[in-house]
Every structure is written in C-alpha cells, then in structure tokens.
C-alpha cells in the first residue's frame, strides 16, 4: 500500500496536512512553497517504526526570506484593528475544533501518543487561541500624574515585532498555539520552525490559520531538518525582535547566547526535574491517581512530568501498592488501537536514556516492581511503564529529567529533608505536593523553587494559569493574562502643557 493510501485510511482530509501530493510544503508569505534545492526529509511514525511521509527541507536562506516577509507584514499588521484580530483568532479556534479528529489522528501518527491523549491536546491547544482572541481586546495602558505638575504621563503597549518561534515534538499543537495565539493577538508577526519529528500537526495549524483569514506574511512556517542552522538565523537576524523556545535547557542556553548579539527579548520554557511529594497525611488514593496523569501522560515525555517521587516513610509501602496496581492496568501499544493508554517513545535516543536511568537505578540498589524493559514484541520504541522502589539520591533519575515512563519512589522522613532534596536541582519548572494540612500546603508550596506547584493535583497546565519556570528552567510566562505581555513593549509618552 502506498504512503498516501495508508494515510487516507486514517485521515479524512489530507489537504489539511498538505499531503494531497508529496512532499508537504512550507508556508511563507501566504504561499505554500517547496525548497529551491528540492531537498526533503522523512517524518517517521514511531508507533510502527516506519516512514510516514516526506516534508520539504528548507534552507537557511529561505528562513531568512520568511523573516523578511514577516517584517514587511508587521509594518501593517501592528496597526490592525484589535476587533479584527479577535475575529480571525476566533475563526481559527472554530476551525481547529471542527478538524479535531484529523489533527489528533495525525498527532498520534507522527508523535506516537495514544489517541485519547492527542484529542485532549487538540482541545487544550484550541483553548489558547480562544483565550488570546479575548486578550487582543484587553490590551491597555494607563495614564498618571508627573512629578512635574505641567506634565502628564501616558503609558501604551506596542507589539515587539517579528517573533521567531521554535517548538518541540512532545506537544506539537499546544506549544504552537500558546505562543502564536499571544503573538498574533498582540499584533506581532511570526516565523515558526516546528520540530522536525512532528511537522504535520504544525502545518495543519498553518492551513487552518490561512483559512481563518490570517493575512499573508503574518504567520510563516518553515520546515527543516537542520534545527541548529535555522536556530542561528532566528536568533541573530536583526529583524527578529523576540524568540520563544520550548525545549531542553542545553539548547535554551545556546539560543540565549546567540540572541545576545542583538539583545532580543526571550521566552525560554526549558527542562524540568519535577519533585512529587506525598506527605503522611495525604489522601493516598487521590495522590496515586494524580501521579498517573502527572508521571505517565504522553508516556512520560512532558517537561512537567513528576520525575522524583518522594513518599513519607510511614505511607511508603501503601503508596507503592496503589501506584503499582494502577500502572499494571495500563495498555501499552499503537496509539490508534482501541483501548491503548500509552504509546511509544519518540526515538531510539529516548529509549536509550530511559534504559540508562533504569539500569543505573538497579545498579545502585533500586528494585523494579513492574515494567523495566523495552516491549520488543510491540517494536523498538515501546518501553514498559515502570515503577522503581528504594530509589536514592545520587541516582541518575534523581539528577536528570528521564523523559520516559519511569516512576522512581524515594523515602523521606521530615518536611525539611524533602524540601531540601526537592530544591537540590539546577532546574525548577514544576513541583507537586499532597497533604491535608493547609498550613503545610502553603508553607511547602512557597518553599519549592519552581515556577508552578500542583497542590493536591497532578495537573498544573491550564490556559488561565501562567506557565513557566525558574532557575535553569528558563524565564517568561505563557498562557494566562500574563502571556500576551511577553509580546508587548511598554512605551511612555510624557506630555507637557503648551
């Protein structure tokens, strides 16, 4: 069966992904274009370990062209009617929801996540467009008196300019809408470089933006298989005034250094190593349920996944039983198959890291109570959901983000001890704590050195909540009423009486 035939059995509208014919194209200046070189790269289906379809592989020069086009479009779009921005974003939201099934199916094909997870992400992604449509109408400044009685001060907010957006593969829809929704609402134009692993979901969002009436040049998308070269262009081109990146801390540091040459405004949402603390007075059933969503969602491939699970020694054994019981009920398999709860990891590199963390834990005294190996009967990218007990500080899993379906449970005895362990990390994105003591919830919640804390919940991501970290997890906030501010400059006008 040909590639297009395989796709058409799962996807209703191949045109949504620019797959009526191959390769899929990039979107620059309101036109769908292929690389002048004719180069393409293949996108893989990790669930079947086979090629999904080819995509055009654009050059750095073509990214440079997209930046110029975006700059030209910005000169008019920055002055666009905010009510028109609202209307366009609302149409985009409606189109995303109308095409949710195809978007989720493609996400499963190229990312591997179970279809239920993919459908949840599409809805989550659409909500950011809906939210920022409203935020376009709420951009406001203020006025004030001056220390000089003859002067008045007026403060206004203006779009920063062209924004370079670099997105990851683990949330191929939501990471685009969370950034682009805010940028377009603010009056900025964008050049997007989606992850090479998951370009089709991104291209579909560009198609729907075009259908919604986003003006030519306002949203541009460049697909490429050489991220570092295109990243250099986005971070050093003087026409780009802001870069927004979600990805690893190491890459974020490189982009920040490159951006310093032109002092660009930056939003960096980087890696985490989230502590998940279960105190002796916690509702253990609720905490175990929360851990399933927090640790194993997307097969553990999210930046806010619990990575270090600290359980008070008095409830440790009981909590291990609850967690093991739940994990053993997961169904690992191909994301489009009925009943599957967890899919494959994205690549062999991801598999290797998870194996390394499990092997290191076992060598240092950890015990695997369920899972712990590649499910080779399903394919090379499938790793069994795993629970490790007797975990200790000093294991790799306590020091590095695993980014896989491995839950390691550590014992602790005192609040001071566990807070110190939780904060003993160079990163600080998310943290979680479970306790019925409201004083402890506030005390520990404020003590954790992270940007987001889930208190008696395993879910911290919400359209209305500011998303972002501290320390080496980056800076800037996305979503919420604060998200649009990342794309606005504040200008003061001091006016004297004549």
From Swiss-Prot:
<keyword id="KW-0963">Cytoplasm</keyword>
<dbReference type="InterPro" id="IPR016163">
    <property type="entry name" value="Ald_DH_C"/>
</dbReference>
<feature type="binding site">
    <location>
        <begin position="247"/>
        <end position="252"/>
    </location>
    <ligand>
        <name>NAD(+)</name>
    </ligand>
</feature>
<dbReference type="InterPro" id="IPR016162">
    <property type="entry name" value="Ald_DH_N"/>
</dbReference>
<protein>
    <recommendedName>
        <fullName>Succinate-semialdehyde dehydrogenase [NADP(+)] 1</fullName>
        <ecNumber>1.2.1.16</ecNumber>
    </recommendedName>
</protein>
<comment type="pathway">
    <text>Amino-acid degradation; 4-aminobutanoate degradation.</text>
</comment>
<comment type="similarity">
    <text>Belongs to the aldehyde dehydrogenase family.</text>
</comment>
<feature type="active site">
    <location>
        <position position="303"/>
    </location>
</feature>
<comment type="subunit">
    <text>Homotetramer.</text>
</comment>
<dbReference type="InterPro" id="IPR010102">
    <property type="entry name" value="Succ_semiAld_DH"/>
</dbReference>
<dbReference type="GO" id="GO:0009450">
    <property type="term" value="P:gamma-aminobutyric acid catabolic process"/>
</dbReference>
<dbReference type="GO" id="GO:0005829">
    <property type="term" value="C:cytosol"/>
</dbReference>
<dbReference type="InterPro" id="IPR016161">
    <property type="entry name" value="Ald_DH/histidinol_DH"/>
</dbReference>
<dbReference type="GO" id="GO:0005739">
    <property type="term" value="C:mitochondrion"/>
</dbReference>
<dbReference type="InterPro" id="IPR029510">
    <property type="entry name" value="Ald_DH_CS_GLU"/>
</dbReference>
<dbReference type="InterPro" id="IPR050740">
    <property type="entry name" value="Aldehyde_DH_Superfamily"/>
</dbReference>
<dbReference type="InterPro" id="IPR015590">
    <property type="entry name" value="Aldehyde_DH_dom"/>
</dbReference>
<comment type="function">
    <text>Catalyzes the oxidation of succinate semialdehyde to succinate. Can utilize both NAD(+) or NADP(+) as a coenzyme. Functions in a gamma-aminobutyrate (GABA) degradation pathway that allows growth utilizing GABA as a nitrogen source. Functions in the GABA shunt, which allows to bypass 2 reactions in the TCA cycle by removing alpha-ketoglutarate from the cycle and feeding succinate and NADH back into the cycle.</text>
</comment>
<keyword id="KW-0521">NADP</keyword>
<dbReference type="GO" id="GO:0036243">
    <property type="term" value="F:succinate-semialdehyde dehydrogenase (NADP+) activity"/>
</dbReference>
<keyword id="KW-0560">Oxidoreductase</keyword>
<feature type="active site">
    <location>
        <position position="269"/>
    </location>
</feature>
<dbReference type="GO" id="GO:0004777">
    <property type="term" value="F:succinate-semialdehyde dehydrogenase (NAD+) activity"/>
</dbReference>
<dbReference type="Pfam" id="PF00171">
    <property type="entry name" value="Aldedh"/>
</dbReference>
